[in-house]
């Protein structure tokens, strides 16, 4: 029991003194009474004091006013004492709106008690109002002032006072009557004295009563024996119950260990399930990303295939042109020889020089085209290298994500294990507390049983003493009765005076007998009460034992239910393990397939790079051949041209139109994109090569609009444009057609000498205005993304444009929707 008493001492020192009946507010300058109770945990001292502190105090010196606590009278250690103090009104604080509280401070300066907060407030008119129910049972509330209510109470008290005065008068009359009754009773007492003769009959009755008391004493002895036997049986039951409780505790400990193991396994399985679900989601995301990357790579491979095919076509076309030019050069040499033999006029030589110059320019243009093709091949190789680098970075990022996944899974497992440990610790603490509570109850029951056993022994001793006293009193009583009979026999032969004296002496033994009877009756009644109390306590102990047995049975049932639930959860966890193992195997198979696809793509990239290197070497050889052929003397070319012109009858006009490149000029400066999405701009696809400025044909551009991002998602070239490119003539055109088709790369006929006009703002520029500045002006009207440099038309929706820009800053990098 001492452990239960020490808990509040250690927990709170402010509860050692309890303040009673503390109101929420007091009047500022009115008399204030403070009632408090000293608990057994504090020892009062004459230097202890009670102070009024403002709420928020930090030390015992922050008091507003105080009074010395008086020492309680008749104080007994270990008992609670009620005390009272009275604070005078002029020492109290004014109505300042602050909260105060009473605090009990010891002579050592320790604060051992604090009251609830209160205020000092002057009475407001609203506070003077009170609500009370109507006395006429009309379910109405009547609002009155305190003064009116007090007046009503005073009137009632005055009426009660008058009634009490009337009652006093009546009671005085009754006292006179009672005095008369006392006199009458005294007379009756005298009459009762005359009834002394009846006492002898009562003595005979008392003898019978004493015999009955003996019988009752024997019955009490029997009851005592029964109680002792029951107490012994109870002790045996307590011993058996303690053994059973110990067995149950051992069973509880074993079941708790099983339960802890089951819970740990359950939590581990839950953590595994959660981690595997997370892995499943991550695998899904990874598969989605890999599929998107594969589609991108396939599209890029397709575009590169198309580029390679187009470049092969261009190479074959240029080879055919080279062979045709070689054949034409041979024919021209023959013609020149024949022409030199036939004609030698100055005009013909001038025409031949012009033709020779044009042929040289055409050869130079073909060289530039070959250089452009080489540059295109180098660009394709760079794109291939870039895609390979992107693949490598993707692999590295994949490995990094896998490492992060493993780290996150390890952290999740650690957190789950810590949570399980905390739960098991709390459960173990609660179970230990319950076991200690049961042990305390059993100890208390054993102590209670020992006390009862001691009380039974004490009662047995009292019964033995009473039996001895009753035997002695019976012997004395029989002796007195014998002496009384002798006196009665002697009084028969004496005078009436002697008989009167004997009559006076007879009541003495009757008073002793009545005292003895009263004592025996009182002792018997006390013993019966004690026996009844003992039986009640015995029944209570028995009930407690039954309650403990029922609790043990309940715990056993609960543990059985927990075992069943644990087995079910183990089965569910095993099934989940099997399902997760299947899912993991499927994902591993899918990952292996994806890795095979990636390895196949990488090998395909390597093959493409080898083929491109081979094509580059072939193109270099072709360029060398062209350079060797173009190094012939211009004299031979002029002769060839003369002979051909004489045979045909007219001067051949060299075609001024350049063959349109299908994949753009690599030396141009377009706004490049990333290239990872596989889309190219139209100006990268179809843009004519830079023409030689010495041809003498000026371009009067009226309107020019820069290329925009109008690429097709499924292919890199427009079928209509490709058809038009196929229709471009390679044969020499007449001079008129040459002059008209000279500016086909722009939107208007250059024969018109018109000013340049912006197609968006309709601003006019002079004909000799710089073309690059004009294009910069036109491009300034378009919206350009600051991240990917993608261009949008001026009338493009601003919200859609901002949403496009915000996608570059989206935190969810894996979101490709």
Curated annotation (Swiss-Prot):
Q: Which GO terms describe its biological process?
A: apoptotic process; negative regulation of apoptotic process; negative regulation of cytoplasmic pattern recognition receptor signaling pathway; negative regulation of toll-like receptor 4 signaling pathway; protein localization to phagocytic vesicle
Q: Which residues bind Zn(2+) 1?
A: 758, 761, 777, 781
Residue spans of biased composition, Basic and acidic residues class: 609-627
Q: Where is the composition biased (Polar residues)?
A: 628-643
GO molecular function terms noted in the UniProt entry: kinase binding; protein-macromolecule adaptor activity; zinc ion binding
Per UniProt, which keywords does this protein have?
Apoptosis, Coiled coil, Cytoplasm, Cytoplasmic vesicle, Metal-binding, Mitochondrion, Phosphoprotein, Repeat, Zinc, Zinc-finger
Q: Where is this region: Disordered?
A: 609-685, 704-742
Q: Which PANTHER family match?
A: SKICH DOMAIN-CONTAINING PROTEIN, TAX1-BINDING PROTEIN 1
What is the name listed in the Swiss-Prot or TrEMBL entry for this protein? Tax1-binding protein 1 homolog
Where does this protein come from, organism-wise? Bos taurus
Which gene specifies this protein's sequence?
Answer: TAX1BP1
């Amino acid at each position: 029991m001492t452990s239960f008493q020490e808990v509040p001492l250690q927990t709170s020192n402010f509860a050692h003194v309890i303040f009673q009946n503390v109101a929420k507010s007091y009047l500022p300058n009115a008399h204030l009474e403070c009632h408090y109770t000293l608990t057994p945990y504090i020892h009062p001292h004459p230097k202890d004091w009670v102070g009024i502190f403002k709420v928020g105090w930090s030390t015992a010196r922050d008091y507003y006013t105080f009074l010395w606590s008086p020492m309680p009278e008749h104080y007994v250690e270990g008992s609670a004492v009620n005390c009272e103090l009275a604070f005078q009104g002029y020492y109290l604080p004014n109505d300042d709106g602050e909260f105060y509280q009473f605090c009990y401070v010891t002579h050592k300066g320790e604060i051992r008690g604090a009251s609830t907060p209160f205020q000092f407030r002057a009475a407001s008119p609203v506070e003077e109002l009170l609500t009370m129910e109507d006395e006429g049972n009309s379910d109405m509330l009547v609002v009155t002032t305190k003064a009116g209510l007090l007046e009503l109470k005073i009137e009632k008290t005055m009426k009660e006072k008058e009634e009490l005065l009337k009652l006093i008068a009546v009671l005085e009359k009754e006292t006179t009557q009672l005095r008369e009754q006392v006199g009458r009773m005294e007379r009756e007492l005298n009459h009762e004295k005359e009834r002394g003769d009846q006492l002898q009959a009562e003595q005979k009755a008392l003898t019978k009563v004493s015999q009955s008391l003996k019988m009752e004493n024997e019955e009490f002895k029997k009851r005592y024996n029964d109680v002792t036997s029951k107490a012994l049986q109870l002790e045996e039951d307590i011993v058996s119950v303690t053994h059973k409780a110990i067995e149950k505790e051992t069973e509880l400990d074993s079941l708790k260990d099983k339960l802890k193991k089951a819970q740990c396994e359950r939590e581990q399985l839950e953590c595994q399930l959660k981690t595997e679900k997370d892995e499943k989601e991550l695998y899904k995301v990874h598969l989605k990303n890999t599929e998107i990357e594969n589609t991108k790579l396939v599209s890029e491979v397709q575009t590169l295939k198309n580029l390679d095919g187009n470049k092969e076509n261009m190479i074959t076309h240029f080879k055919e042109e080279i062979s045709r030019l070689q054949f034409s050069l041979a024919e021209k040499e023959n013609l020149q020889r024949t022409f030199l033999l036939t004609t030698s006029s100055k005009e013909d030589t001038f025409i031949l020089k012009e033709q020779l110059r044009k042929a040289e320019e055409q050869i130079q243009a073909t060289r530039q085209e070959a250089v452009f093709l080489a540059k295109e091949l180098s660009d394709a190789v760079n794109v291939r290298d870039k895609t390979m680098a992107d693949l490598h970075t993707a692999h590295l990022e994949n490995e990094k994500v896998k490492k992060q996944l493993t780290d996150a899974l390890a952290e999740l497992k650690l957190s789950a294990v810590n949570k399980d440990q905390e739960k098991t610790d709390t459960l173990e603490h609660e179970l230990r507390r319950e076991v200690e509570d049961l042990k305390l109850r059993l100890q208390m029951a054993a102590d209670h049983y020992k006390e009862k056993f001691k009380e039974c022994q004490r009662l047995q001793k009292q019964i033995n003493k009473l039996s001895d006293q009753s035997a002695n009193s019976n012997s004395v009583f029989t002796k007195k009765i014998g002496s009384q009979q002798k006196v009665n026999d002697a009084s028969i032969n004496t005078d009436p005076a002697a008989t009167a004296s004997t009559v006076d002496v007879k009541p003495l033994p009757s008073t002793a007998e009545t005292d003895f009877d009263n004592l025996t009756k009182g002792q018997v009644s006390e013993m019966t009460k004690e026996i009844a109390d003992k039986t009640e306590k015995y029944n209570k102990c028995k009930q407690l034992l039954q309650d403990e047995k029922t609790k043990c049975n309940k715990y056993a049932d609960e543990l059985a239910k927990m075992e069943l639930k644990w087995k079910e959860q183990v089965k569910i966890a095993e099934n989940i393990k099997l399902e997760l193992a299947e899912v993991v195997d499927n994902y591993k198979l899918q990952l292996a397939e994806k890795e095979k696809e990636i390895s196949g793509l990488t090998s395909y990239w390597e093959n493409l790079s080898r083929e491109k290197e081979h094509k580059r070497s072939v193109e270099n050889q072709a360029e060398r051949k062209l350079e060797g052929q173009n190094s012939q003397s211009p004299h031979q070319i002029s002769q060839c041209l003369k002979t051909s012109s004489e045979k045909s009858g007219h001067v051949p006009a060299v075609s001024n139109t350049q063959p349109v490149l299908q994949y753009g000029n690599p030396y141009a400066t377009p706004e490049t994109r990333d290239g990872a999405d596989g889309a190219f701009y139209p100006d990268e696809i179809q843009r004519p090569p830079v023409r030689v400025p010495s041809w003498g044909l000026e371009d009067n551009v009226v309107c020019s609009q820069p290329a925009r991002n109008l690429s097709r998602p499924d292919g890199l070239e427009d079928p209509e444009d490709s058809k038009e490119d196929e229709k471009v003539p390679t044969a020499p055109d007449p001079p008129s057609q040459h002059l008209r088709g000279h500016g086909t790369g722009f939107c208007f006929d250059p024969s018109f000498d018109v000013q340049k006009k912006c197609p968006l703002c309709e601003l006019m520029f002079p004909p000799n205005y710089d073309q690059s500045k004009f294009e910069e002006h036109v491009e300034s009207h378009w919206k350009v993304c600051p991240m990917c440099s993608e261009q949008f038309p001026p009338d493009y929706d601003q919200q859609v444009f901002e949403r496009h820009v915000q996608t570059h800053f989206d935190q969810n990098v894996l979101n490709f929707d």
